[in-house]
Amino acid sequence: MSKVRVYEYAKEHQVSSKKVIEALKDLGIEVANHMSTINENALRQLDNAIDGTNKKAEAPKKETTSNENGNSKGPNKPNMTNSNEKSNKPNKPAGQANKPATANKSHGAKPATNKPANTSNQTQSSGNKQPAGGQKRNNNNNSNRPGGGNPNRPGGNNRPNRGGNFNNKGRNTKKKGKLNHSTVPPTPPKPKELPEKIVFSESLTVAELAKKLYREPSELIKKLFMLGVVATINQSLDKDAIELICDDYGVQVEEEIKVDVTDLDVYFENELNEAVDESKLVERPPVVTIMGHVDHGKTTLLDSLRNTKVTLGEAGGITQHIGAYQLEIHDKKITFLDTPGHAAFTAMRARGAQITDITILVVAADDGVMPQTIEAINHAKAAGMPIIVAVNKIDKPQANPDRVMQELTEYELVPEAWGGDTIFAPISAKFGEGLENLLDMILLVSEVEELKANPDRRAIGSVIEAELDKGRGPVATLLVQDGTLNIGDPIVVGNTFGRVRAMVNDLGRRVKKVGPSTPVEITGLNDVPQAGDRFVVFEDEKTARNIGETRASRALVAQRSATNRVSLDNLFEHMKAGEMKEVNVIIKADVQGSVEALAASLRKIDVEGVNVKIIHTAVGAINESDITLAAASNAIIIGFNVRPTTQAREAAENESVDIRLHRVIYKAIDEIEAAMKGMLDPEFQEKIIGQAQVRQTINVSKVGTIAGCYVTDGKITRDSGVRIIRDGIVVFEGEIATLKRFKDDAKEVAKGYECGITVQNFNDIKEDDVIEAYVMEEIERK
């Protein structure tokens, strides 16, 4: 049994709190006030004490009730003699026997304190009759009228009814009801028992918590106030406050962790954590990423494997965006991802490493380990993937595979021939040497890894590439990591959504469904997703739409808050950024991966005093809206493998917007870097242009000291800075106030001529002082 407060006990037993406190003190139990609690033992003693008091109080009430019932029977028989009244009331005078109603009032109604309604009616009825004998007149202005109080209403019946009251119909009915209602209060409902445990998620309002605890919100607000927490009925309570209240009531608390269905990562985590039926798992093709330094032969290797000329389609022989291809060798499939190799595409390569199973590290035998080779090793190790080293270009005369092996041992890649666990495969991608051995090694590693997937579930996977096609709209290249993707599936891709309208495989053929570890190009999305986003197929289009719209709105809010939010941690950074100049840049490219790579490269440019600010990135041609944004923000537009429309070109000419078009990323980076150097605060170099010797000084009121000078070297100009040198020491540095030759102002005075000079804010010029004139010349930064 839980503890009860004094006021709660008093309310339940319909007694005053003061009476309960006195009863407790009589029992030897000290309490402070009505808010004090009563334990279980004290409650038993108090119940016995209160019950005993109530029984004693009920005894006289029963006697009174019996007397009252006996008196009420008298007036029901008006023709009877007064013998009954005398027997019931032997002390009553005989002169009052003809007034049974008055007799009832004076004797029967007096002890009946629990029936105020009858007393009221009897008082009013007797007040309508004239007083008899020595009784005082009732204090009623209309009591001398036998009819009733109101002259406009007919008088009531003066004959007593069976209950002993006068039959005054329609009078004081409402008052009687009110008196009965106010005198007999309703019994308060007994509070429900407290639950053993409540479950909540995140937070609860005071009203919600009160509902769970079967208590009034006001009671919880009082408890919170006593605990030092000021809260209103609709205020949310944190976990600590909820636990504090429930602990006071002795109720257990359990926090329910809600799963955010809009978080796509949850579906991938559930796949890892849930127990999967082994009978549904089938072997899936390995996903292989080819990594390495630029121009080490990655695309040529993949080209040789596919027997196509992919390299010829790339600008400058450099892979500009990710390609995904699937090969079939020995009745088994292998999925290849071709990631660009140079440093500008580090982010793309890191993204590719997170969705693959095996990494092929291509190293040129004639070049050795390069910076991008080291980055590729770090990405593969961070992803926990096995690495197969393909030593390429062994056909060249200067090739030295042993040197490559030796250099890679520094990065914990020890060949199997040297007692390590890393597979090394010497190849020549150009002539096709050693490719079959490399493929066998890939299949061997995939068998050891036991790569399996469940094709019977809804598909999940990642975005390899995305672009905006002029005829088809948003197009995304997806890699299905688990499940089967079908045409018509409702899908959420990153912050976009849609229904799979068409699917095209790497050979350009339309397909109706694709299984795990298969790359496919889809259409039907409402917007272009980001490369590296995850996708999940849902059961219906309504769910996919709701989740996609929620994710898009959250991303927009996060983007806005990220640009405006300032905390104490980054306050100093914002202050420093306020002192820096910015180059506003808009990037448009043919594919999303190129946009990200170019943006990442521009942000890494470190030029003192200038900061790059990328205000907009998108996929597709340069349009008029881009020109409008660039004109409003004074930005430069960089187009990578895209061209401006005719309307955009005309608008750019009218608005004087600078558009730079490139096909190779290095040229775009170098051009922006050069522009940034041009925007730096210019460097100045001091150049001495002349000297003059003070031959005479003249003091003029309201003008100051005029120095009569002779130019000994160079020239003195009106806008030059000057130094006053006395005995080889600079005593003042400032600007010329006036320069005159005779009485005329002069712009400059050459060597061998005399002039008059006044210096701003300096009059302490002495004879034989030297005035040195100089200018600050701007020099180009290197």
Curated annotation (Swiss-Prot):
Q: Matching Pfam families, A to Z?
A: EF-G_D2, GTP_EFTU, IF-2, IF2_N
**MF-aspect GO terms:** GTP binding; GTPase activity; translation initiation factor activity
Q: Looking at the record, which segments are called Disordered?
A: 47-196
Name the Gene3D superfamilies on file: 1.10.10.2480, P-loop containing nucleotide triphosphate hydrolases, Translation factors, Translation initiation factor IF- 2, domain 3
Q: Where is the tr-type G domain?
A: 283-452
Please list the residue ranges that the record marks as compositionally biased, kind Basic and acidic residues: 53-65
Q: Write out the entry's keywords from A to Z.
A: Cytoplasm, GTP-binding, Initiation factor, Nucleotide-binding, Protein biosynthesis
Which portions of the chain have biased composition (kind: Polar residues)?
66-81, 115-129
Provide the binding site for GTP.
292-299, 338-342, 392-395
What job does the chain carry out?
One of the essential components for the initiation of protein synthesis. Protects formylmethionyl-tRNA from spontaneous hydrolysis and promotes its binding to the 30S ribosomal subunits. Also involved in the hydrolysis of GTP during the formation of the 70S ribosomal complex.
Query: This protein is called what?
Result: Translation initiation factor IF-2
Organism in which the protein naturally occurs: Listeria innocua serovar 6a (strain ATCC BAA-680 / CLIP 11262)
Q: Which gene name belongs to this protein? A: infB
